[in-house]
Amino acid sequence: MAGEDHPWHGSILYNLLMSAKQKHGSREEREVRLGAQCWGCACGTQPVLGGEGLPGGQALSLLYRCCFCGENHPRQGGILYSMLTNARQPSGATEAPRARFRTPCWGCACSNAKPLVGRXGLPAGQVPSLLYRCCFCGKKHPRQGSILYSLLTNAQQTHVSREVPEAHRGGEWWQLSYCTHNVGGPEGLQSTQAMAFLYRSYVCCEEQPQQSSVASDTPVRADQTPAAPQEQPRAPWWDTSSGVQRPIALKDPQVVCEAASAGLLKTLRFVKYLPCFQILPLDQQLVLVRSCWAPLLMLELAQDHLHFEMMEISEPNLMHEMLTTRRQETEGPEPADPQATEQPQTVSAEAGHVLSVAAVQAIKSFFFKCWSLNIDTKEYAYLKGTVLFNPDLPGLQCVKYIESLQWRTQQILTEHIRLMQREYQIRSAELNSALFLLRFINTDVVTELFFRPIIGAVSMDDMMLEMLCAKL
């Protein structure tokens, strides 16, 4: 058969004959072929079919004749081979991997670490399925990324100093919820305290210590002399824990008020030139615009990414000066009339009363919520239509028509979300949560914050009527 080409070359019968022929070969031929240590056969050598000379009566289907050493052993990659090699590893030298790296081990995350199968050599009878031999340090420990490893590393982090978490103050605020329900202890928080708590937690990422701290509760002995009172650092303007209403104002009122005025102009232009809005009578248009101009403006300013900062004013006179500077520049010096001089003071007092810390924080929270959702241009337009066509307003005569407009706007928004291949229910819930925050924004606060330095004592209702009748 040797030296001839047979049609059965490669067939099952040919392989059986060749395997039976190799059993009677001399051992010198096998040793001359390769004198290195056998690591298992990964080639296509045929399995040994005979049972002669096999120790212990091992399963013949798992034994292969290696093409490197010529001996019968399990094939590399087989189940029996993996079990035998894993059983040999605990008895091998463990000092070799330690010389590889001298750094402390943080867990093995590679694919070379084999799980320990047997229980021999494990301290305190640990579960071997969770212990891996690390390729960095050669020790047995939980694998990095496992549940046990996470529990152990989290338990070790409790012993770290308290200065470490301060590095995470600039965390992702958009990953937190903006819901104001169930905040605080069993007594609950008031509306102003709840908004202040939300601002401290989600915007500033810090909490101010209360006055009743550990240092104040420490008893003082009789022989100790009371220390000199130190001046406590003043809390920021948004801290309402003291319960004192502090006067606040815009840090850059001219730039912010001009941006808000431009946003109001774009909002009224968007509403006025809607075909379904133009067919309404003027009185019905006024009912809609006067009730929803502030929420529409908030959506417009959020779309324009308006950023504004507040600052605390130590003296009320300074706040009055900032609120009336813009009007004095446009109208000139005011006459020396007692009644004329009392009017700006009244506006200033109302402004200091309306501009509460919680109200300003509600506006900022709404802006941050919209920015975190990445609302596109069409979604902003459909949200404005949903806010504009509100059939529950008092004084509306065409309620059915307004209901149909609101329903149609919501249907178009639904089609747009599905067209963008988004999860409809999740995206709708996110947009509804943003609209829910508009309920905490007061119209008077928007007027005093963005428009009072410009319009003075003019009513915003008169401004709406004038802008609807004018050609924008």
From Swiss-Prot:
Subcellular locations according to the entry: Nucleus; Cytoplasm
Record motif LXXLL motif 1, residues: 13-17
Key words, A-Z: Cytoplasm, Nucleus, Receptor, Repeat, Repressor, Transcription, Transcription regulation
InterPro entries xrefs: NHR-like_dom_sf, NR0B1/2, Nucl_hrmn_rcpt_lig-bd, Nuclear_hrmn_rcpt, Nuclear_receptor_repeat
GO MF terms, alphabetically ordered: DNA binding; DNA hairpin binding; double-stranded DNA binding; nuclear receptor binding; protein domain specific binding; protein homodimerization activity; RNA binding; RNA polymerase II-specific DNA-binding transcription factor binding
Main location: nucleus
Sequence repeats: 1-67, 68-135, 136-202, 203-255
Domain notes: Homodimerization involved an interaction between amino and carboxy termini involving LXXLL motifs and steroid binding domain (AF-2 motif). Heterodimerizes with NR5A1 and NROB2 through its N-terminal LXXLL motifs.
Family membership noted in the UniProt record: Belongs to the nuclear hormone receptor family. NR0 subfamily.
Subunit annotation: Homodimer. Interacts with NR5A1, NR5A2, NR0B2 and with COPS2. Interacts with ESRRB; represses ESRRB activity at the GATA6 promoter.
Stated role: Nuclear receptor that lacks a DNA-binding domain and acts as a corepressor that inhibits the transcriptional activity of other nuclear receptors through heterodimeric interactions. Component of a cascade required for the development of the hypothalamic-pituitary-adrenal-gonadal axis. May also have a role in the development of the embryo and in the maintenance of embryonic stem cell pluripotency.
Protein name: Nuclear receptor subfamily 0 group B member 1
Natural source organism: Rattus norvegicus (Rat)
The encoding gene: Nr0b1
